């Protein structure tokens, strides 16, 4: 894990190495979940590129997520510091009890370990999320991995899951599958 001082950082928190929120995985190959730092932007970008069918955003967008939205995002790294998992999202300004999960990516080496769920739960159990009682995301109808993840989260959190069409193919330029808005909640973050 490479953490350096970022001279532009308004907060001393960003200048410190990130402490792992959780250590997951097997004893022989642990994974560390923590808030992202500016040094993680390119690694996040590369991870998402390696995880089709995820939409790849610009490296700049991932740098912004790693700095401006770091309290609502998480990365998972292996012992070598390689980013093998990422979750991004934000608390909605018009609904401060709702976290909108934008993207979850898990690299091939870490798939099948429950890392996606652990990344989401690492974010949801942070003190910054104490007032959050709903999680929203969008999922294409055929993304079975994402549907499975969010159904498992709803079951674990003992919360209802509802969905409805949100963005049509036409709204997405005709080249993208429609996106359903999925909502889990209400739930209590202190019971996750």
From Swiss-Prot:
Pathway: Amine and polyamine biosynthesis; ectoine biosynthesis; L-ectoine from L-aspartate 4-semialdehyde: step 2/3. GO terms for biological process: ectoine biosynthetic process. Residues 31-192 form the N-acetyltransferase domain. The keyword Transferase applies. Keywords: Acyltransferase, Transferase. InterPro entries: Acyl_CoA_acyltransferase (IPR016181), Ectoine_EctA (IPR012772), GNAT_dom (IPR000182). Does not acetylate amino acids like GABA, L-ornithine, L-lysine and L-aspartate. Belongs to the acetyltransferase family. EctA subfamily. This is L-2,4-diaminobutyric acid acetyltransferase. It comes from Halomonas elongata (strain ATCC 33173 / DSM 2581 / NBRC 15536 / NCIMB 2198 / 1H9). The lineage of its organism: Bacteria, Pseudomonadati, Pseudomonadota, Gammaproteobacteria, Oceanospirillales. The gene is ectA.
């Amino acid at each position: 894990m490479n953490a350096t001082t970022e001279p532009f950082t308004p907060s001393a928190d960003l200048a410190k190495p990130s402490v792992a929120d959780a250590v997951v995985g097997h004893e022989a190959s642990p994974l560390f979940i923590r808030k992202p730092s500016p040094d993680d932007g390119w690694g996040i970008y590369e991870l998402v590129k390696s995880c089709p069918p995820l939409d790849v955003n610009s490296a700049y967008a991932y740098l912004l997520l790693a700095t401006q939205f770091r309290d609502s995002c998480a990365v998972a790294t292996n012992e070598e510091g390689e980013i093998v998992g990422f979750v991004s999202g934000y608390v909605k300004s018009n609904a401060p009890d709702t976290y909108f999960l934008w993207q979850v990516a898990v690299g091939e080496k870490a798939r099948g370990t429950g890392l996606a769920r652990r990344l989401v739960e690492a974010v949801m159990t942070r003190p910054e999320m104490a007032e959050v009682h709903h999680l929203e995301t969008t999922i294409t109808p055929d993304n079975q991995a994402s549907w499975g993840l969010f159904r498992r989260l709803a079951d674990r959190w003992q919360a209802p899951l509802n969905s409805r069409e949100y963005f049509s193919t036409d709204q997405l330029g005709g080249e993208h599958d429609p996106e359903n808005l999925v909502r889990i909640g209400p739930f209590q973050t202190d019971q996750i």
